[in-house]
Amino acid sequence: MKRRNADCSKLRRPLKRNRITEGIYGSTFLYLKFLVVWALVLLADFVLEFRFEYLWPFWLFIRSVYDSFRYQGLAFSVFFVCVAFTSNIICLLFIPIQWLFFAASTYVWVQYVWHTERGVCLPTVSLWILFVYIEAAIRFKDLKNFHVDLCRPFAAHCIGYPVVTLGFGFKSYVSYKMRLRKQKEVQKENEFYMQLLQQALPPEQQMLQKQEKEAEEAAKGLPDMDSSILIHHNGGIPANKKLSTTLPEIEYREKGKEKDKDAKKHNLGINNNNILQPVDSKIQEIEYMENHINSKRLNNDLVGSTENLLKEDSCTASSKNYKNASGVVNSSPRSHSATNGSIPSSSSKNEKKQKCTSKSPSAHKDLMENCIPNNQLSKPDALVRLEQDIKKLKADLQASRQVEQELRSQISSLSSTERGIRSEMGQLRQENELLQNKLHNAVQMKQKDKQNISQLEKKLKAEQEARSFVEKQLMEEKKRKKLEEATAARAVAFAAASRGECTETLRNRIRELEAEGKKLTMDMKVKEDQIRELELKVQELRKYKENEKDTEVLMSALSAMQDKTQHLENSLSAETRIKLDLFSALGDAKRQLEIAQGQILQKDQEIKDLKQKIAEVMAVMPSITYSAAASPLSPVSPHYSSKFVETSPSGLDPNASVYQPLKK
């Protein structure tokens, strides 16, 4: 019998690192860094009166233009710049200033936090809420402290550039989906043609191809299981769990069906399903435990060793079926899995055991024993091995539960710290609101103080001007007094010096001065008279002005009356025209009435003539005799009766014997 030994490679388990605390501390420091950067940028914005966060999208735009020029050419880079410029102009023209600044700042900070390694989680969402609240509550209203005209183009770029990038991303996504759809269509066509080719082959070659495919899939599953083991050790969930567990089951079912068909064809009378029910139930229990513990074992190398057991185990099972039915219970699940042509599910338990015991040398021995082919193991040893695997799996389950409890305790501590942080955030928000109110009051007081200072400065300037004017007048008065005192002193000195010499000249001078004084008094009287006359003239002129005002009022009233009279004249002329039209219509009506009356008189005359003629005819009618008795008919009334004729005076004589017509 051909013997195949399987090589079991040593599994090197990496050291288990507790990354929970490391992740928590790293994330807290990361978000603290974000908050520090945000606070520094806001402080720089407030101090330098410029929105520095708007420079980040501009820098991204420059990098994207450089990359497009480097990898896609000049034409695409120029097209990208034109599209971005157009989008910026549209945002600059059609979005209001306050909403533009709010949307730009909010987008910049949200995008900055979005680019972290953490993605969407509770701290990022809380930071987003904080940014949006600060932008909407504080910075949305205070735009006076910034250079609006300088910041507005950058704000428009912060909105227009992401719109352009989203447009290009949507285009690439649509093209990617269309390409995937085309690939799927081509893949379906290829599979259809491949199935046609396989169905055209003989059944022996089809079986060979199936076995080759199964071997390839088993070989491919080996590195997948290695990666899943590493991920499981690092605390992740294996992504290829379903694939690796379902492959042995699929092979088991397919080969079991083929085995049943062969048994029916050869009429062996062996029912493997009824014989191996206890073993199957135990295997299903083990597989259930494996699926819940997420443990696997690398045993794809044992496929070759199980192929040699197919004939022996089938023969022993058939002989025991004929001899003793109790021997089936003692058969190992490894022989059952070998007869059905599938890999035993206990191999995944051995894999888990190999993982858990790789730290000790005894674990290495167990691993080497597990790699021995199945045909060298005895039946009790297999059951013992399975029980040991179950115990170890239970120990692993307890360890995982302990880890779960530790994680839950850490989650509870984190939730308590989160609550404390939320309470601190609420207190900080209240303090922030109080500080905002204080700042608002301080700004209002500052504005009031500025207004008061400007008013006081104006008053001070007016008082300084008045003071300078009064000082000038005072200086002039002082100068004039000094001049008068100097002239008086000179006059006194001159008089004292020449008192004895020129008395006569002084007397003459006094006389002349007295005469001049009299003349001046006369002139003063004349001037006063002239002033009185002028005052009288002024009064007369004032009266004349008042009269002129009255005349103006009268003229305005007169013009109004003239307008009214003109309007009345126009209305009167219109009324006269209407009256003339009415009179002319009345004359026409009278004429028509007279004509109608004349016609009526003519008709009356004609009626009278007709009546006379009728009377003459009636007068002639009695001379005509009719034979009334000869006819049995009733008497006929005459066509003309005197009853219908009105009694009117006629010129005919009814007593005349012979009718004599009137001569015309």
From Swiss-Prot:
It is found in: Rough endoplasmic reticulum membrane; Nucleus membrane. Glycans are attached at residues 324, 340, 452, 655. The chain crosses the membrane at residues 28-48, 75-95, 120-140, 154-174. It holds the Pfam family Macoilin. GO terms for cellular component: nuclear membrane; rough endoplasmic reticulum membrane. Residues 253-274, 320-367, 631-664 are annotated as: Disordered. One of its GO terms (biological process) is neuronal signal transduction. Its main location: endoplasmic reticulum. The modification Phosphoserine is found at residues 305, 332, 631, 634. It is a multi-pass membrane protein. Residues 320-348 have a biased composition (Polar residues). Residues 253-265 have a biased composition (Basic and acidic residues). InterPro entries: Macoilin. Keywords: Endoplasmic reticulum, Glycoprotein, Membrane, Nucleus, Phosphoprotein, Transmembrane, Transmembrane helix. Belongs to the macoilin family. Plays a role in the regulation of neuronal activity. This is Macoilin. It comes from Bos taurus. The gene is MACO1.
